[in-house]
Every structure is written in C-alpha cells, then in structure tokens.
Swiss-Prot record:
Membrane spanning stretches: none
Naturally occurring in which organism (per UniProt): Caenorhabditis elegans
Stretches the record annotates as Disordered: 95-158
Tissue: Highly expressed in the germline.
Disulfide bonds: none
Disruption phenotype: RNAi-mediated knockdown results in embryonic lethality in 5-8% of animals. Surviving animals have enlarged P-granules in the germline.
Functional summary from the UniProt entry: Plays a role in modulating RNAi activity and P-granule accumulation in the germline. May function in association with CSR-1 complex components such as drh-3 to regulate RNA transcript accumulation in germ cells.
Gene this protein is translated from: elli-1
UniProt protein name: Enlarged germline granules protein 1
Subcellular location: Cytoplasm; Cytoplasmic granule
Recorded superkingdom: Eukaryota
Polar residues compositional bias, start-end: 103-113
Biased composition (Basic and acidic residues): 142-156
Taxonomic lineage from the root: Eukaryota, Metazoa, Ecdysozoa, Nematoda, Chromadorea
Amino acid sequence: MSNGKRGRKAKPTNKEKDMIFTPGCVDCHMNHLPFQCPRPVMTKKLPEWEKKSIGMGKLKNPLDSKVKMYSEPARQTTWKEKLSQLNHENMSYNAHNKRSSRQRGNSYRLPQQNIPPPSHHQSSQVMRGFQNAPFQMQPHYNNERKPQSRRNDTMRASKSAYAAATAPVKKHVRPANEQHMRKLNDLLRPFSYGSDDLYEETQPFVKETSLANVDIQICQTRPKVPPGKMWIFESRTIYDENGNCVSAREGAMEVSLASRMHNEPIVIVSMNDSMCF
C-alpha cells in the first residue's frame, strides 16, 4: 500500500524561502553576469574539467592552444566538393530521381564528369565552328514518355474548356473599301475650325499615284484669306548643343496689305523650303 506521497514535491522550508538569487560572475566573483565581465577572455583561468573536454590537460600553457584554436580559419571547400554538392542538390530536387535514391545512391545514375578545375588567369570561351548547328533546347523527358504528346502537333487554343468558353469574342473586321474611304475624306474635312464661311474649295485634282480611280475627284479645302490681308505662318524650334529638340513653337500672324505702301515689297525667307508661292 502506498501512502500517496510518492512523486509529490516537498514543501519548501523557511530557509529556502528566505534565499534570494543574486547573479554573480564565475571568474571575478562580482555581482554582474558572466557575459558582462570586463576581464578579457584570454586571461580567464579554465577549470580542470573544461581543460579535459577541450583536450588541453597535458599541455603546459592551455591559453596558447586556445588562442591557436580560435585563430585558425575554417578549411575552404575545393571545387570537387562543390561539384559533388551541386550534383546532389540537383538529383534530390527532381521527384523522379528521389524515388530511386532510397534504394541506390544518386551516384548510380550520374555519369562520370571530367570537369577541369577553374583557372582564373584565362577565361574559358565556347568557340563554335561555322559548320556546326546552333544550340537547341531539348524537350523535357516527361514529354517523351507521354503518348498523347502535342510537341509535333498543333498546340491547343486554351488549356481548359472554361478558359475557351469565357474568352472574349473577336469581331471580324472587313478591310476598308478605298472608294468609301475617299468619300469620307471629301465629307470630313481635315481642317475644321469655325464656320463654313471661313473656307473655300479649290479646283479638284487627281493624284498621280491613283491612276485606277480617275473618276474620283478630291477637293482640297484651305482657309480663306480676307481681302487686303495675308497670313504669315512661322515655326521656331530650339535645339541644344547635342542636337536634341528643346522646344518647338508655331504661330500665325495676319498682315494687313492696305497699311503698307504700294511699292513696298514683302520679303519672306523659308529655311526649309516648306512654303510654296
């Protein structure tokens, strides 16, 4: 018969209640924590059990070997070890090869790769001959195993029936009729501003390029100049020293001919031969 006291924690005595934990340093026995100790690490004395765990029990000066242990850098991996790590990552990433890696190692599937060590003083360049064919991407091995592969056949219009059903309907647009477009150009004037009284129609002419449609006559519309006046159009373009356009401004000026003398000439200079007289 058990008295029911097994496994129960004993009640703390008055001595344990009065005890208060005060943090102290192991090395200098002060009231700060061990990582706050101002003494350097190398001057601290190691206990015997720590010397044996490190392997410095038989040494005369254990601090020398500790400095040597901390000062030696880690060994860098060679190019062969890096190559084996990359091959292991690539083989473990593929789900098809992961199934076979449980039974036999990944090196069973890997062919022998003779890769020379990298040389930093010379850059390796791939030289292709003139008669060699260009590089072509090979298809994935999953496409070769599928009997319903569509690599050599026409591709599907959509991946799913829902995407095909919800696709936007494209309207079939017929090519514009040339005769119909020319009639629209006659009706819709290219320069429309103000009322019809400000415009005049010139004599119809036929373009030299459209010899097939000689019966179609195109009337040209241009602004009507008031009597006794003339318009002067000017355009200013400012370029910087590099030849880039900074600003371009166009303007028109109306000149009254009645205010001038009868024999006073008007000289208009066109730099780009865009004005026709």
